């Protein structure tokens, strides 16, 4: 009070005091606005201003800008993608999803009209309180309690139907995605041939769930609020007109406030779609890191690599944590602005919008009769007070409902931007699946112009094809034989291993494939199996049903012991084929696995077979599958490397007796006698296809002995060279073993293994 008394008398006037307060407020806004807007917009301008020609991760700014341009946003591309996905959610006019949507819409409409009825009841209850009419109060309160029963049921039904709609959408998307994912070996090619989809498991699970939930929730958050706004505004206007109130100014105020709020929120809204899409991507990276550690836990434990793996895992988690913090920070300022506009500014505007009609109301409409007008003029003051109180309570309840609806509509824009992120990820998943199914592969997510596409007509060994690989070759299914005409072997990364391969394997021929590591042996099997495409040339081969591939590490499926033998058939398919358990037992006897049946407890025993069976047992189980399916051609990729020589010979002899043509990759000379032809790669893009007769075996054996003789002195010579370098204090001009490439080390290890096994197997060679 002492400070106030010392102010000049001019400042004590109400009008002057208001002007001073307004000036102080404007000055504060002027000083704080740069800080506020700077926080709201983030650090974008700073990053662009101080950016280097390369981004922090080495990415060119042009490419980074192009990626930002393609980031999810609410634009025409978003609506086009959403429409295509909605066609998957609603495949036909009469479907389950459309029926659920109809019931959901009916529940939302019912809730709107119940809200209007409850608002009128609120006004009636307040009127009875003002009039001090206890009997009427009890009657109106009873109505209010009775209407609560259907109202609560409708509220619960809305949530239930929204959950059912989310589940139906998810089921429809998952079904469609699985059909694409498991058609034409897409599940393999999307990870090994195409580089656009980093984490298919993330897209198939979490992204689909978030998209389905977002669509269902957004429908509720848009349909009901829009209906609420239309119905409540119509009710308010009709009520005001019936009492002769002014409806022009409230409508103008409402329009200005809503338009201003929408403009401000739109201007300062962060790009939630881009932020959410990036968060989902980083979640997928973190999940991949965890699954990678689980899949390679034994190797990591042998190396003692837990520290580096923990650092990589923490780095991935910290990346996700930074993204979540960024989203929370941007939401902090956005929600603050949103609450100020929608809670305080709208509340003040609502009071004005309610007060103006009540103050200007005459109590009758211009269309009313003279008797009604006179009755309104003759109404007692206490009745007028109760009528005004009822009108104020009803109008304010309806106006609050309308304001809440408008707020939800405007807040839904943030949800729409988040939906744009989920839509982009799900749409891109389907796009990649469809492209891969149609043979269109991209090794990165970057855009490439059509004229920059790769796979030229003429390729040479050692070159790398840049850009998307175009498939110009032909694959022709034939009844018998395998024939390659000018067939190149090109890896998914574009490396040309063999420029042109020409060979023919007729029925009854048994082909042995040899060569150093990385020369294209397994790559040829991938092409024959249809995993890799034929980029040029012509490949004649039987249908996939007549070819069976057995890798070095056979896959053990989830199921019974019987399921391991008949994989990938089911029990029903086995029965349709006419195979009995007795015949399966004979197959196990052929591969020396009969004891497994007794050890594991019969055909119906269920175990984690990849851990229960040893390496040799798993390889013999893979050969058992070959005898079950009885293909025309068996592609054997070192599939008996862990099997003893005697059992291996027994299995190969039985396969030949069964009429199965063998195409074998092996380093064991003991298997040469089971093959009639040889395909030898030299590792430099060259190859040799010839009949494997006695002279060929002798020449190969002579070459082997010569190499053994040359290699036997290498350790001593290397040791002597090291001693001389140490005495002279000089370094050797030859590369040390530690500097050799990884594939060369593997070649030496394989050669040493061949040398060690040569003596043991020499007596078995013909």
Swiss-Prot record:
Compartments in which it is found: Peroxisome membrane
Summary of the function given for this chain in its UniProt record: ATP-dependent transporter of the ATP-binding cassette (ABC) family involved in the transport of very long chain fatty acid (VLCFA)-CoA from the cytosol to the peroxisome lumen. Coupled to the ATP-dependent transporter activity also has a fatty acyl-CoA thioesterase activity (ACOT) and hydrolyzes VLCFA-CoA into VLCFA prior their ATP-dependent transport into peroxisomes, the ACOT activity is essential during this transport process.
Family of this protein: Belongs to the ABC transporter superfamily. ABCD family. Peroxisomal fatty acyl CoA transporter (TC 3.A.1.203) subfamily.
Membrane topology (UniProt): Multi-pass membrane protein
Gene Ontology process terms (BP): adrenal gland development; cholesterol transport; fatty acid beta-oxidation; long-chain fatty acid import into peroxisome; motor behavior; oligodendrocyte development; peroxisome organization; positive regulation of myelination
MF GO annotations: ABC-type fatty-acyl-CoA transporter activity; ATP binding; ATP hydrolysis activity; ATPase-coupled transmembrane transporter activity; fatty acyl-CoA hydrolase activity; long-chain fatty acid transmembrane transporter activity; very long-chain fatty acyl-CoA hydrolase activity
Residues bound to ATP: 515-522
Residue stretches of biased makeup (Basic and acidic residues): 750-766
UniProt keyword annotation of Hydrolase present: yes
Lineage: Eukaryota, Metazoa, Chordata, Craniata, Vertebrata
Protein's name in the database: ATP-binding cassette sub-family D member 1
Encoding gene, per UniProt annotation: abcd1
Keyword Ribosomal protein: no
PROSITE patterns linked: ABC_TM1F (PS50929), ABC_TRANSPORTER_1 (PS00211), ABC_TRANSPORTER_2 (PS50893)
């Amino acid at each position: 009070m002492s400070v106030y008394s010392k102010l000049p008398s001019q400042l004590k006037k109400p009008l002057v005091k208001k002007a001073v307060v307004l000036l102080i407020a404007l000055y504060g806004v002027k000083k704080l606005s740069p800080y506020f807007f700077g926080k709201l917009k983030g650090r974008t301008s700073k990053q662009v201003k101080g950016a280097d020609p390369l981004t922090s991760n080495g990415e060119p700014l042009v490419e980074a800008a192009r990626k930002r341009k393609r980031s999810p946003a609410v634009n025409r591309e978003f609506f086009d993608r959403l429409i295509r996905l909605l066609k998957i959610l609603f495949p036909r006019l009469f479907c389950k999803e459309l029926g659920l949507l109809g019931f959901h819409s009916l529940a939302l409409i019912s809730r709107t009209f119940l809200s209007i009825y409850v608002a009128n009841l609120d006004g009636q209850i307040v009127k009875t309180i003002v009039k001090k009419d206890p009997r009427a109060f009890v009657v109106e309160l009873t109505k209010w309690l009775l209407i609560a029963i259907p109202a609560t049921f409708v509220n619960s039904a809305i949530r239930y139907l929204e959950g059912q709609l989310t589940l139906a959408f998810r089921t429809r998307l998952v079904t469609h995605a699985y059909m694409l994912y498991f058609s034409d070996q897409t599940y393999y090619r999307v990870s090994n041939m195409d580089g656009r989809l980093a984490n298919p498991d993330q897209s198939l699970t979490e992204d689909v769930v978030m998209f389905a939930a977002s669509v269902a929730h957004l429908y509720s958050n848009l349909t009901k609020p829009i209906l609420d706004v239309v119905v409540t505004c119509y009710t308010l206007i009709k009520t005001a007109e019936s009492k002769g109130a002014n409806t022009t100014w409230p409508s103008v105020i409402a329009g200005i406030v809503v338009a201003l709020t929408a403009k401000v929120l739109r201007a300062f809204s962060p790009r939630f779609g881009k932020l959410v899409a990036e968060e989902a991507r980083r979640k997928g990276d973190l999940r991949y890191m965890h699954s990678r550690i689980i899949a390679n836990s034994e190797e990591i434990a042998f190396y003692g690599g837990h520290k580096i793996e923990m650092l990589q895992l923490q780095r991935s988690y910290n990346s996700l944590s930074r993204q979540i913090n960024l989203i929370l920070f941007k939401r902090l300022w956005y929600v603050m602005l949103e609450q100020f506009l929608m809670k305080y500014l709208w509340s003040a505007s609502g009071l004005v919008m309610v007060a103006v009609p009540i103050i200007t109301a005459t109590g009758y409409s211009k269309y009313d009769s003279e008797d009604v007008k006179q009755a309104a003029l003759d109404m007692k003051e206490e009745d007028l007070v109760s009528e005004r109180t009822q009108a104020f309570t009803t109008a304010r309840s309806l106006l609050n409902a309308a304001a809440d609806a408008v707020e939800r509509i405007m807040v839904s824009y943030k949800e729409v931007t988040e939906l744009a992120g989920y839509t982009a990820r799900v749409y891109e998943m389907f796009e990649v699946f469809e492209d891969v199914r149609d043979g269109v592969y991209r090794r990165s997510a970057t855009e490439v112009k059509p004229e920059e596409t790769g796979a030229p007509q003429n390729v040479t060994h050692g070159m790398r094809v840049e850009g998307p690989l175009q498939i110009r070759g032909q694959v022709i299914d034939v009844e018998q034989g395998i024939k390659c005409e000018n067939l190149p072997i090109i890896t998914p990364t574009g490396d040309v291993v063999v420029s042109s391969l020409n060979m023919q394997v007729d029925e009854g021929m048994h082909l042995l494939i040899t060569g150093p590591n990385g020369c294209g042996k397994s790559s040829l099997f991938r092409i024959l199996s249809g995993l890799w495409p034929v980029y040029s040339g012509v490949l004649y081969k039987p249908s996939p049903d007549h070819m069976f591939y057995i890798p070095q590490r056979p896959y053990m499926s989830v199921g019974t012991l019987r399921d391991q033998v008949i994989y990938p058939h089911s029990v029903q398919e086995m029965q349709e084929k006419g195979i009995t358990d007795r015949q399966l037992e004979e197959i196990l006897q052929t591969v020396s696995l009969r004891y497994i049946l007794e050890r594991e407890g019969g055909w119906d025993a269920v175990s984690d077979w990849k851990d229960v069976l040893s390496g040799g047992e798993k390889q013999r189980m893979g050969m058992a599958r070959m005898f079950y399916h009885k293909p025309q051609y068996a592609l054997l990729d070192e599939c008996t490397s862990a099997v003893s020589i005697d059992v291996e010979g027994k299995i190969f002899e039985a396969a030949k007796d069964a009429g199965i043509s063998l195409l074998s990759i092996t380093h064991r000379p003991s298997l040469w006698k089971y093959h009639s032809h040889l395909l030898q790669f030299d590792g430099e893009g060259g190859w040799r296809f010839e009949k494997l007769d006695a002279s060929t075996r002798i020449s190969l054996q002579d070459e082997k002995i010569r190499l053994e003789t040359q290699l036997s002195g290498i350790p001593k010579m290397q040791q002597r060279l090291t001693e001389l370098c140490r005495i002279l204090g000089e370094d050797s001009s030859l590369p040390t073993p530690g500097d050799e490439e990884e594939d060369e080390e593997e070649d030496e290890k394989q050669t040493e293994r061949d040398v060690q096994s040569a003596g043991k197997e020499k007596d078995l060679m013909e």
